């Protein structure tokens, strides 16, 4: 017996064009951060040259309001100093070299350099949410960008203000989908896809039952972040629609063995 919700929601009847890829797709995590230099133009070129269907990346905001491609809240991992990213202006950020070689790309530079590439973009902060979405909307990027976040608030903002953009599920929706797959809650999704780890808080999410449930709801399932061949093989056999990985070349090889 299902529990019911009083909230009226729509089922995802028509799949978003962003998701129009057959079989298991390769999401190069930060461009393939083990095989290349994460979140740089170099790593994105690497992923494109491999033929990856998608690039997963992140956006942070400079102190003067410019969206940049960057994951961490600070620069310690790259320059050994705990300078908060959003405390630095664009002039200061442009002087920094990642891996002693590469500039931190802006979102604009990324989208202009790779006009035919599909991106899965994680909005890292509330501050970057509005300027990033305003820019992506201004270049009509809804067919090649999916918005992701660990924040329900940010995803709700995208749903309300930019409904044409593909959106992955937030934490609350993922929990509802899991309960629905177990027959504990009725759930009709509003998002376009679900992107999950195998486990979260000790609960297994990437199960055959959840994947089948998502597919019945016309949702594609992407699993992160998978870097070993055995797990890739298991997920491909389970029927996931995409795998987010730091090793896109390895995943490409594993997918090839299934054809």
Question: Where in the sequence are the language-model features?
Answer:
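Phosphate-group recognition and catalysis centered on beta-loop-alpha active-site segments
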Residues: 1-259
């Amino acid at each position: 017996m299902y529990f019911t919700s009083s909230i009226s929601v729509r089922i995802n009847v028509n799949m978003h064009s962003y998701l129009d890829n057959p079989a298991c797709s390769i999401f190069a995590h930060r461009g393939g951060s083990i095989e290349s230099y994460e979140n740089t133009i170099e790593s994105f070129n690497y992923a494109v040259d491999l033929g990856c269907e998608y690039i997963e990346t992140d956006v942070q905001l400079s102190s003067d309001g410019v969206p940049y491609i960057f994951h961490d809240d600070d620069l310690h991992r790259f320059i050994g100093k705990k300078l908060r990213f959003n405390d630095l202006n664009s002039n200061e950020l442009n002087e920094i070299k990642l891996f002693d070689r590469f500039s931190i790309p802006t979102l604009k530079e990324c989208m202009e350099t790779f006009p035919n590439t599909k991106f899965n973009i994680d909005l890292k902060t509330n501050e970057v949410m509005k300027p990033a979405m305003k820019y992506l909307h201004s270049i009509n990027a809804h067919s090649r960008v999916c918005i992701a976040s660990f924040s329900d608030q940010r995803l709700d903002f995208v749903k309300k203000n930019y409904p044409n953009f593909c959106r992955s599920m937030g934490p609350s929706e993922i929990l509802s989908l899991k309960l629905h797959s177990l027959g504990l809650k009725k759930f009709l999704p509003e998002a376009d896809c679900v992107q999950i780890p195998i486990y979260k808080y000790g609960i297994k999410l990437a199960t055959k039952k959840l994947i089948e449930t998502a597919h019945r709801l016309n949702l594609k399932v992407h699993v992160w972040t998978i870097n070993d061949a055995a797990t890739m093989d298991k997920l491909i056999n389970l029927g996931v629609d995409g795998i987010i990985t730091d090793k896109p070349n390895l995943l490409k090889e594993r997918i090839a063995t299934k054809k």
